[in-house]
Each structure stands twice: as C-alpha cells, then as structure tokens.
Regions:
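Hydrophobic helical h-region of N-terminal Sec-dependent signal peptides
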Residues: 7-12
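N-terminal signal peptide c-region/cleavage motif recognized by signal peptidases
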Residues: 14-17
C-alpha cells in the first residue's frame, strides 16, 4: 500500500483492510494550469476539460469567474469567456455538448471570508464560447456536486442557510448554517426540477460518480462547511429505480475537497484535505472504487498534494488540475497550484517509474 502525504502537523494512519492492490497505471505531468487557484469546478465536454473558478489571492478581489479549456490532443490550455457571476464551491458537470454550473458561494467582499450561497444556474456552450443563465435551483447551496444519470443532472449535498437563518445574512464559520443531504434533479430538456430521496449523511466538499445506472457519493465534510469541520469516510449508493440509498465500503481515508471522475467502471479520486481539532493536512493519495466488488483500490500517489481542485477522465486518463497546496488552516495562503497531473489508466509507467 502507498503511504499518505505527511503534513507537518499530522501523520495519517494506514488504509483500512478494505483496500486492495491497485490497478495498473501511472501519473504523468501535463501543461501547467495558466491561472492557479482553488475551489474550482471541472467538466468534460467533447473530449476537452473545462476548469471554472478562481478563489483566493490569485483572483482579483479574491474571486473571479475564470474559465479555461484543456485539449489533451495538443496538451494546451485556452482561456475562455468568464462566467458572468463569479462563484466558488459550485457544482459543475458536462452534459452532451454543454457545461452546467449549479449554486456555489458568492463572496461579499474581497477581505471577508463570509459568503452567500446561491441557487443560480448557468449553461456554457463551447461551440459559441458563451454563457446563459437558466432558471434557479430550488435550494441555495455551495459545496455540492453534480452528476449525470438518465439524461438528467443530479445535484447532491453542499451547505446553505440554516432553517432559522434569513437569506440576506452571509455564511461564515461563526454564523449558523447547515450541511445538507439534499438531492435535486435537473432536466436540461425541460428546465424542470425534481426532488429525490436525501442522502443518508449530509455532507459538503464531497466526491461521487455514476456506474451501471447508480449514483455513488463519498467523503466530504460533515457539520460545518468551513475549515475545522470533521471529514467523513462514509460511502453511499443510490438506486434510482427504488429512490433509496444504502451504505457501501468506507473510503480508506476520511477527507474532503477531492478531485474525482468515473470511467463507467471505477470511480477515481485523488487529493483532498483532512482537518479537525487534532490533525490537519493535505493528501497526495489516490484511490479507485469498484462498485461491482464494493472494494477500494489504492493507486500510486500524485506528486503534488492538493485539495479544492477538479478532475475529469478523457481517453483513459484521469486529469487533475490546479488546487490549494495546504489546508485552509495550514498556513499555506489562499493562492493555488499550477500542477496538472493525469493518471494514465491501465498502462504501467515507462521504465518502471511512478
């Protein structure tokens, strides 16, 4: 088994016995991300990877709507039109020939850590390099994820207003808010929303994927959406035929803020952060979850430990881009990493290297 990234303030324990020997593959470096940042969203459309967002010191005013497109055929990044309303911690996915963005947080000022959760929805068309706003999502929230199943987009989890809070009050670590287990489904063909059975564990900063017609969610923060909250290793499976959830094998390491993607067989996940009152750190670790066997495989680790980054699978490569190098309480500053690493699935490294 591979060792976790060792933080100056914490050493993480070995993986659970549920982990198995990893499938073949190796990590490879690609063209660096042109606008390093954190808390981004990612989507794959027509064989290209789109990364949206800019949160922290590298963004003007602390938040910007940067959109960059990566073409694996040329190993080049291209700047695209910014989203009209910059957000962070948005849920994002590709569906057919478009990119969809759901919710997220809007900073109230460049110097404040407070933010407003939003329910605004945006659609980006790569063919015209243009954005348009769609009807709102039912629930205002950020830190959720978006997955595609049965020609609809499922937005899961996140954090938003506390039931006793008003919508005109910003959220911070010291202001009442709640992590949600909400599942809302968007139909791009009609613009309509439907609510489904909630997850068993409310969570934000989670990961997930779709395999064989079922949704899987894993990890994330529970309780608060801010640094200092506990991370979970809980994994759940959703069956759309019965609108029910069930528990599956736990992750090897509890954490949040991972990059993730699925190739339709396995769900790949890397990086992330772990923090509570006793420990804080960022992971290099990578794993793959096999729903058919309900097993986790440990993969070789990334070179650069990161969280708040995004991933996508294109032509058998699990790409990961940008992200923060240290935990929010680790003293690393609010900038970002230019690192772009891809796990080449099923191919050993040339010369036996990583």
């Amino acid at each position: 088994m591979k060792s976790p990234f060792l933080c100056a303030v914490a050493i993480f324990a070995a993986a659970s016995s549920a982990s198995a020997q990893y499938p073949e593959g190796h990590w490879q470096n690609y063209a660096p991300y042109p606008q390093p940042t954190q808390e981004v969203g990612g989507a794959v459309v027509n064989g290209k990877l789109y990364i949206l967002g800019a949160y922290g010191a590298n963004a003007p005013g602390g938040l910007a709507g940067w959109l960059n497109e990566y073409d694996p055929a040329t190993d080049k990044w291209t700047k695209k039109t910014d989203i009209p309303m910059p957000v962070h911690h948005q849920a994002m996915t590709g569906f057919r020939d478009k990119v969809y963005v759901f919710g997220g947080g809007v900073k109230i000022s460049a110097t404040s850590d407070n933010w407003y959760p939003t329910n605004r929805v945006w659609e980006y068309t790569p063919a015209t390099n243009s954005w348009r706003e769609l009807g709102p999502m039912p629930t205002k929230r950020g830190g959720g994820i978006a997955l595609v199943l049965n020609n609809r987009i499922w937005v899961l989890g996140g954090a938003g207003y506390h039931p006793l809070q008003t919508d005109d009050v910003s959220i911070s670590a010291n202001v009442a808010h709640r992590t949600v287990n909400t599942v809302e489904v968007f139909d791009p063909a009609t613009g309509m929303w439907e609510t489904k059975a909630p997850m068993l564990v409310p969570r934000n900063h989670l990961a997930g994927g779709v395999v064989n017609g079922r949704i899987y969610v894993m990890g994330g923060r529970i309780g608060s959406s801010f640094v200092g909250a506990s991370s979970t290793d809980a994994v759940e499976e959703y069956d759309p035929a019965t609108d029910t959830w069930r528990v599956r094998a736990r992750m090897p390491y509890p954490r949040s803020g991972m990059a993730f993607a699925s190739d339709g067989k396995l769900i790949y996940m890397s990086g992330g952060e772990y923090l509570n009152r006793d420990m804080v750190g960022v992971f290099r670790n990578a794993e793959a979850y096999d729903p058919a066997r309900n097993l986790w495989y440990e993969l070789p680790p990334m070179s650069v430990a990161r969280h708040g980054f995004a991933g996508g699978i294109i032509n058998g490569v699990f790409y990961t881009a940008t992200g923060q190098l240290q935990s929010g309480t680790g003293g690393g500053g609010p900038g970002g990493s230019p690192a772009v690493e891809g796990f080449v699935i099923g191919k050993p490294a040339p010369g036996g290297t990583r």
